[in-house]
Amino acid sequence: MGNPLILIEIHNRAGLIRFNRPQQLNALNGAVMEELAAAAESFDKDDAVGAIVITGDERAFAAGADIKEMADASSVDMLLADRISKWDRLRKVKKPVIAAVSGFCLGGGCELAMACDMIVASETAKFGQPEINLGVMPGAGGTQRLTRAVGKAIAMEVVLNGRTLSADEAYRFGLVNRVVPVEQYLNEALKLANEIAARAPLAVRLAKEAVNNAFESFLA
C-alpha cells in the first residue's frame, strides 16, 4: 500500500490538509484533488473546526498539474475525470480556507492557492502560471483571479511570458497576505486560522460569502 496522497490534522480549531507527494513536488492529479475536496468538505461540516489550512512542504506547495497523468490520459479520460467539479467543491466550502505556501506554487498549484481565501507565504515561495510553456493557457479561474489580484500588466507578463513572482513581489502586488521566514510559514497560517476560528462562525461565513460575491461576480 502506497503513502497517502494527503495528510489531515487538527490544530486547535484549524483543520490542516497537507499534500503528501514530495517526490512529485506535490503535483496535482485527479486523485489528489478528489481527496482534497473530500477533506475540505469534511472539515466544513465539523463544528470543532473554524478554518482550514492547505499546505504542501518547504520545497513545494504544488508545482502544477501532474503532467504524467495528463500525458497518459485520452481526451475521453480527461472529460470523464470532471476536474472542474472538484475545484467547484472546494470553492463552495463555507469556512475560510488559507493556503500556506513555500517553494514552488505553479500552474494548478498557483490556481489552487488563489482559489483559497488568503495566502501566507514563506520567503522561498515562487508563484507562476507557466502553462504557456506547454502550449496551453491557465484554467480553473487562474487568469481572472490573478488579474484581479495583481492587475492587468503583471498578469499579462505572468500568463503570456511565464514570469515567476518571488514571495516579496507577490506581496507587493497584492497576491499574498503575509511573507514570513520559511520555518514560520505553516505556524503563521495556523495562527491566522485559529484567530479567525475564534470569531462568531455565522458572521465569518457570511462575511466570506459577501467578499467572494463581490470578487467573483464576473468569474465563470
Q: Over which residues does each language-model region extend?
A:
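Conserved CoA-thioester-binding segment of acyl-CoA-metabolizing enzymes
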Residues: 1-57
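Terminal peptide-recognition signature
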Residues: 17, 21, 35-36, 54, ...
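Glycine- (often His-adjacent) and acidic-residue-rich active-site loop
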Residues: 34-37, 45-48, 56-92, 105, ...
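Crotonase-fold acyl-CoA enzyme core
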Residues: 91-204, 208
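Short, intrinsically disordered, charge-balanced linker/junction segments flanking boundaries
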Residues: 177, 215-220
